[in-house]
Amino acid sequence: MGFNLTLAKLPNNELHGQESHNSGNRSDGPGKNTTLHNEFDTIVLPVLYLIIFVASILLNGLAVWIFFHIRNKTSFIFYLKNIVVADLIMTLTFPFRIVHDAGFGPWYFKFILCRYTSVLFYANMYTSIVFLGLISIDRYLKVVKPFGDSRMYSITFTKVLSVCVWVIMAVLSLPNIILTNGQPTEDNIHDCSKLKSPLGVKWHTAVTYVNSCLFVAVLVILIGCYIAISRYIHKSSRQFISQSSRKRKHNQSIRVVVAVFFTCFLPYHLCRIPFTFSHLDRLLDESAQKILYYCKEITLFLSACNVCLDPIIYFFMCRSFSRRLFKKSNIRTRSESIRSLQSVRRSEVRIYYDYTDV
């Protein structure tokens, strides 16, 4: 689902063909570039993905355990739980890429990546993006429109909307799996598009445009909600000082969402523009293609890092999550420490009066 940046790596046969073609003009340049390219693919990327795989398993495993003990009392918590599920599924695709890039799997192992792993990776990445947009809308409604249509605030509406998101993403993804039905050979295995049927190639292109539109829509929603909440808080803080502090926390929360979104997803989608909306990558020379390839893989890695940054959203935005985390780790927040100290002092005073009465 989406452009197979994890798999279609500036097709190796084309890249090596260009290098061998130019080998008569440059004695050591192409070989050096090929070595650097191979080291980046077989060492750097597998190590990076292994790091975020381990980190994501630990962080999201902890998040699953904590959310398991939190009731679905608000739509916000339910959206967060959906993001945890999407992140975990996305994380489980990393080992397949690590094995393939490190060269441990057989040559036909890439067929599994093209047909299944890549589809799951992108499907869950865009599922997370959609739920980040829904969280921003939820924060906007809670702050700016707290007395709006009650149906939009109900947990039932949230569950129905979440199911619709998963169904739509599944409908977009399944044809990419079914229509990747070509017979893998050593000649076509380097390009996932060659493993698709003609209809599969068209469907893949259509889904790529849909995903790009989804990203742009969520980007506009995030920016719009952040600006609207900031302006509303700025106006209300002059009139209702007591309520402004609570609403300012909502503004800080959505600021975390915007920061994670811009850090993880914006660079990748800016880098994929030449691949999505034109054939600019085919018009570039060899060195420019390599630069674009490195940028593409680095920004894709940033997108994958979202599975490690989402737990930050849970901690800063979900009070129930942070309280449960502190409770299980025997760490007290500042407010809890103050309340505990006040309780101890009251009990000491009570004991003193009981003693003096005797």
UniProtKB/Swiss-Prot annotation:
The keyword Iron does not apply. One of its GO terms (cellular component) is plasma membrane. InterPro entries: GPCR_Rhodpsn (IPR000276), GPCR_Rhodpsn_7TM (IPR017452), P2Y13_rcpt (IPR008109). Signal peptide: none annotated. Glycans are attached at N4, N25, N33. It is found in: Cell membrane. Residues 1-47, 97-116, 181-208, 278-297 are extracellular. Disulfide bonds join C114-C192. The chain crosses the membrane at residues 48-68, 76-96, 117-137, 160-180, 209-229, 257-277, 298-318. Induction: By expression of p53/TP53 and by DNA damage in a TP53-dependent manner. GO terms for molecular function: G protein-coupled purinergic nucleotide receptor activity. GO terms for biological process: G protein-coupled receptor signaling pathway. PROSITE patterns: G_PROTEIN_RECEP_F1_1, G_PROTEIN_RECEP_F1_2. It is a multi-pass membrane protein. Expressed in placenta and prostate. Weaker expression in thymus. Not expressed in thalamus, hippocampus, pons or cerebellum. Overexpressed in squamous cell carcinoma of the lung. The keyword Disulfide bond applies. Residues 69-75, 138-159, 230-256, 319-358 are cytoplasmic. Keywords: Cell membrane, Disulfide bond, G-protein coupled receptor, Glycoprotein, Membrane, Receptor, Transducer, Transmembrane, Transmembrane helix. Receptor for lysophosphatidic acid (LPA). Necessary for p53/TP53-dependent survival in response to DNA damage. Promotes the Hippo-YAP signaling pathway and thereby modulates glycolysis and oxidative stress production by the regulation of hexokinase-2/HK2. Belongs to the G-protein coupled receptor 1 family. This is G-protein coupled receptor 87.
